[in-house]
């Protein structure tokens, strides 16, 4: 399953760090990285988005205010250096709350929670939505377009799927 993400953060270092974490994670796809909530409006409302990494402190509009206009199906993960906003964040349907500086382990823990929530949804079909099958190959994950698969065979000796 590939989850589409976006980042909104005025801090260039925080933005770059989250971009690197997403690029490092084969099951995440970055739709956009924005320096303000205003810049992100079109990208968020015109793309299928699963996760939004959203800073709280921003100049034009706070992340807490912006969260109120984010589509309800999007999982919002707030990213901030201020733990005192946690209660307010959950009041606007935060899915998770990460304190800066964000480690890769914390980032992955949050993403894992999002994956698990989507997997619990009976109506969620990642192959139908994404159009890709993700398989492990030579110690990394590879995305294979569903339309390119002719058949899958698991009859070899070590029970690894053979995809053609």
Identify the role of each PLM range.
Residues 1-4:
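Non-catalytic signal-transmission and effector/linker regions of two-component phosphorelay proteins
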Residues 11-32:
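Two-component/phosphorelay signaling modules centered on CheY-like receiver
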Residues 13, 23-24, 37-124:
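CheY-like receiver
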Residues 18, 86, 149:
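Conserved RecA-like P-loop NTPase ATPase core
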Residues 34-36, 57-58, 129-135:
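Short gly/ser/thr-rich secondary-structure transition/capping motifs
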Residues 112-164:
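Conserved binding/recognition cores within well-folded domains
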């Amino acid at each position: 399953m590939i989850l589409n993400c976006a980042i909104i953060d005025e801090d260039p270092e925080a933005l770059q760090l989250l971009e690197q974490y997403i690029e490092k994670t084969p099951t995440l796809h970055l739709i956009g990285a924005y320096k303000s909530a205003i810049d992100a409006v079109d990208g968020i409302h015109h793309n299928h988005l699963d996760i939004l990494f959203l800073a709280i402190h921003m100049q034009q509009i706070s992340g807490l205010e912006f969260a109120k206009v984010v589509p309800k199906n999007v999982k919002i993960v707030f990213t901030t250096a201020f733990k005192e906003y946690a209660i307010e964040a959950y009041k606007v349907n935060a899915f998770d709350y990460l304190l800066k500086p964000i480690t890769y382990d914390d980032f992955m823990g949050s993403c894992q929670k999002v994956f698990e929530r989507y997997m619990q949804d009976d109506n969620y079909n990642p192959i139908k939505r994404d159009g890709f099958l993700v398989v492990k190959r030579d110690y990394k994950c590879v995305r294979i377009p569903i339309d390119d698969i002719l058949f899958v065979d698991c009859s070899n000796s070590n029970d690894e799927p053979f995809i053609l």
